[in-house]
C-alpha cells in the first residue's frame, strides 16, 4: 500500500475563479487506497469530451478559464488532478512517482469514465504524459489542443526535446532549481515568478493543495524525471512520436506562449513538424509557460478552427 496524505478540504474553500464541483474515484485498478480527483463539467451526455491535463506544479485550477468555454460549446469537460497534485491524494515518497505511475492513472481514468470522441488538451507534463495516450486506444481520440509541450525521448534525435533540455541557464535549469532546491518551497511565490500576470489570489489558489513540504513530493519529482528519464518513458515516448507522425488523422490546434523559456517556440515548431496535419500555431506574444492563463482566447480560437476545418 502506498503511503499517501490528503490535502484538507478547507484549503480549497472560496478559491478565486474555481466554482467547480469535485468528483472522486477511490477504486482505480493499480492504485489501492488512493483517491483521485477530477472535474466533470458541461453536458455529461455530450458526444464530445475535452480531456484537460495539467502539468508541473499545477492542478485542474489551471483550466479555470478554458473549462467554461468548452462547456458552453455543449461538450463534456474532464480535468483530472494527477496523484500528488490538486485534490488527489499525495504519496509522500518520491520513489512512488514514475512515468508509468502517472500514465497508467490517466489510462485507467479514461477507461473507467469510458471517454470517447476525446479532444486531448495538454501542456507541460500534461503533454509529456498525455501525448502518449492516443496510441493506446486511437479510436477514443478525435482532436488535439497542444500548448507548450513535447515528448521526452532522445534529445540527440528529436529536435523538440533537444531544444528543451539544452536551453540557457534561465530555462529548465532555473526551473528545476526553483522547484527542487528550496527546503521550504512556496508555490505561490514560484507561480508569481514564472507567471507574472497572476494576481495574489490566483497564485495562492495554485498553492492551495500544498500546505507544507510533506505534500510536495510529486512537485519535487517531476523535474528530476525530466533530467533522468527512465527507460519506460523513453520507449513509450519514442513509440508516440511514430504515432503522431504516421497514424494521427485527427484535428489539431497548437498555441504557443512566446515568452516561455522552457517549452517555447524553439520546442514547439519542431513539435509542429512532428504532428501529422498540424496547422500554423496561434502565437500568444504575452503568454509564458502557463499558456492556460490566456486560456479563454486559446479555447475560443481552437473551437473556431475545429468548426472551420471539420
Curated annotation (Swiss-Prot):
Catalytic activity: 1-haloalkane + H2O = a halide anion + a primary alcohol + H(+); 1,2-dichloroethane + H2O = 2-chloroethanol + chloride + H(+)
Binding site for chloride: 125, 175
Active-site residue list: 124, 260, 289
EC number(s) from the headed UniProt entry: 3.8.1.5
Domain AB hydrolase-1 positions: 49-295
Keyword field: Detoxification, Hydrolase
GO biological process: 1,2-dichloroethane catabolic process; response to toxic substance
UniProt note: pH dependence: Optimum pH is 8.2.
Keyword Glycoprotein listed: no
Role played: Catalyzes hydrolytic cleavage of carbon-halogen bonds in halogenated aliphatic compounds, leading to the formation of the corresponding primary alcohols, halide ions and protons. Has a broad substrate specificity, which includes terminally mono- and di- chlorinated and brominated alkanes (up to C4 only). The highest activity was found with 1,2-dichloroethane, 1,3-dichloropropane, and 1,2-dibromoethane.
Subunit structure: Monomer.
Protein name: Haloalkane dehalogenase
Organism, as annotated: Xanthobacter autotrophicus
Amino acid at each position: 500500500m502506498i503511503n499517501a496524505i490528503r490535502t484538507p478540504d478547507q484549503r480549497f474553500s472560496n478559491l478565486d475563479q474555481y466554482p467547480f464541483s469535485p468528483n472522486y474515484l477511490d477504486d482505480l485498478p493499480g492504485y489501492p487506497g488512493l483517491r483521485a480527483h477530477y472535474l466533470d463539467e458541461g453536458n455529461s451526455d455530450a458526444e464530445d469530451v475535452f480531456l484537460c491535463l495539467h502539468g508541473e506544479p499545477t492542478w485542474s485550477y489551471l483550466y479555470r478559464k478554458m473549462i467554461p468555454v468548452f462547456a458552453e460549446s455543449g461538450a463534456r469537460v474532464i480535468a483530472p488532478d494527477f496523484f500528488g497534485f490538486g485534490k488527489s491524494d499525495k504519496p509522500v515518497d518520491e520513489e512512488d512517482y514514475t512515468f508509468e505511475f502517472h500514465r497508467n492513472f490517466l489510462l485507467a481514468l479514461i477507461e473507467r469514465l469510458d471517454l470517447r470522441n476525446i479532444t486531448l488538451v495538454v501542456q507541460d507534463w500534461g503533454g509529456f504524459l498525455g501525448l502518449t495516450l492516443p496510441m493506446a486506444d486511437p479510436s477514443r481520440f478525435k482532436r488535439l489542443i497542444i500548448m507548450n509541450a513535447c515528448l521526452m525521448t532522445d534529445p540527440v534525435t528529436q529536435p523538440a526535446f533537444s531544444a528543451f533540455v539544452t536551453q540557457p541557464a534561465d530555462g529548465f535549469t532555473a526551473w528545476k532549481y526553483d522547484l527542487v532546491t528550496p527546503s521550504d518551497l512556496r508555490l505561490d511565490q514560484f507561480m508569481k515568478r514564472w507567471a507574472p500576470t497572476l494576481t495574489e489570489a490566483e497564485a495562492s489558489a495554485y498553492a492551495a493543495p500544498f500546505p507544507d513540504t510533506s505534500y510536495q513530493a510529486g512537485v519535487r519529482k517531476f523535474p528530476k524525471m525530466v533530467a533522468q528519464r527512465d527507460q519506460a518513458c523513453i520507449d513509450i515516448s519514442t513509440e508516440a512520436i511514430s504515432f503522431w507522425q504516421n497514424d494521427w488523422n485527427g484535428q489539431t490546434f497548437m498555441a504557443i506562449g512566446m515568452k516561455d523559456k522552457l517549452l517555447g517556440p524553439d520546442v514547439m515548431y519542431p513539435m509542429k513538424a512532428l504532428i501529422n496535419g498540424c496547422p500554423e500555431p496561434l502565437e500568444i506574444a504575452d503568454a509564458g509557460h502557463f499558456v492556460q492563463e490566456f486560456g479563454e482566447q486559446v479555447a475560443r480560437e481552437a473551437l473556431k478552427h475545429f468548426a472551420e476545418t471539420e
